[in-house]
Amino acid sequence: MKALSKLKPEEGIWMVDAPKPEVGHNDLLIKIRKTAICGTDVHIYNWDEWSQNTIPVPMVVGHEYVGEVVEIGQEVRGFQIGDRVSGEGHITCGHCRNCRAGRTHLCRNTSGVGVNREGAFAEYLVIPAFNAFKIPDDISDDLASIFDPFGNAVHTALSFDLVGEDVLITGAGPIGIMAAAVCRHVGARHVVITDVNEYRLELAKKMGATRAVNVAKEKLEDVMQDLGMTEGFDVGLEMSGVPAAFHSMLDTMNHGGKIAMLGIPGGDMAIDWSKVIFKGLIIKGIYGREMFETWYKMASLIQSGLDISPIITHHYNVDDFQAGFDAMRSGQSGKVILSWD
């Protein structure tokens, strides 16, 4: 089958002819329709330090997808041939304390699709049936293919009460932008997003951000004053992994504020802990999606009118995958979709 693989320990992704995966007793075989390129895939393409320490070579990559069930393991129940599915990319062990307590998103033995095991950038993918999520008929393939990063946005944004609150989002990547849309949809008052990428700040405006602030040109404190904010932000969503952005968030949070952190710093990050202590801040780390509450929330949000389609800015056939990766690496894109049909 046709697949995109990290074939060599160097910069790049390669089209290969890979063997069709075998279906286990508890698995589904999915014929891939569309995939989306994730920031993780860009890290793997670039072969940065994280990738060198994490990714076995060769490896079929990719974990954002939608497809159709074409074969079902003999012990699987609840799925039929032809079901349209996406799936949770974190394969969990089922036997650790958190898995047995129903907190599978906190499994300490997680294996990642397209990271630790063969991925979705292929004509066919095998995953455990437990990880598959049926896509409602009124949700398009395009939207279903980005449910994985949308889930990161939903998990982060819905960590705390948002109704009537003022929200600061640091980092206008696709996940941060989708989080801004979620916050506005569920009733936040002001949603301010910061970055230095003008293209993505404009996307954030289209997705409903109250203000999209280029911190290289504008002071966050001035924006707060313009909005009539006198006490700071109630909720912070840190999506950038940039220390300066997190420091700015700590400076502008209200006392008793709550922060959800999804962005991963490049290394050790020192902060002024006295601000956390004296402001009484709550900080929550976010990894992946809650299984499967986040997935149900995603579908329900879209069905209730949330429009995240503007975040999809580029479409390519998989044969033109290089153009898709070039678009993602440029930073001048939202989500990039590859069609496998």
Swiss-Prot record:
Binding of Zn(2+) 1, residues: C38, H63, E64
Tagged with keyword Hydrolase: no
Localization per record: Cytoplasm
A Pfam family that the UniProt record links to this protein: ADH_N
Catalytic activity: L-threonine + NAD(+) = (2S)-2-amino-3-oxobutanoate + NADH + H(+)
A GO cellular component entry from the record: cytoplasm
Annotated binding of NAD(+), by residue: I175, D195, R200, L262, G263, I264, I286, Y287
Enzyme class: oxidoreductase
EC number(s) stated in the UniProt entry for this protein: 1.1.1.103
Keyword terms of this UniProt record: Cytoplasm, Metal-binding, NAD, Oxidoreductase, Zinc
Active site residues per record: T40 (charge relay system), H43 (charge relay system)
Binding site for Zn(2+) 2: C93, C96, C99, C107
Site (Important for catalytic activity for the proton relay mechanism but does not participate directly in the coordination of zinc atom): D148
Cofactor section: Zn(2+)
Family, as annotated: Belongs to the zinc-containing alcohol dehydrogenase family.
Protein name per its UniProtKB record: L-threonine 3-dehydrogenase
Organism: Shewanella loihica (strain ATCC BAA-1088 / PV-4)
Taxonomy of the source species: Bacteria, Pseudomonadati, Pseudomonadota, Gammaproteobacteria, Alteromonadales
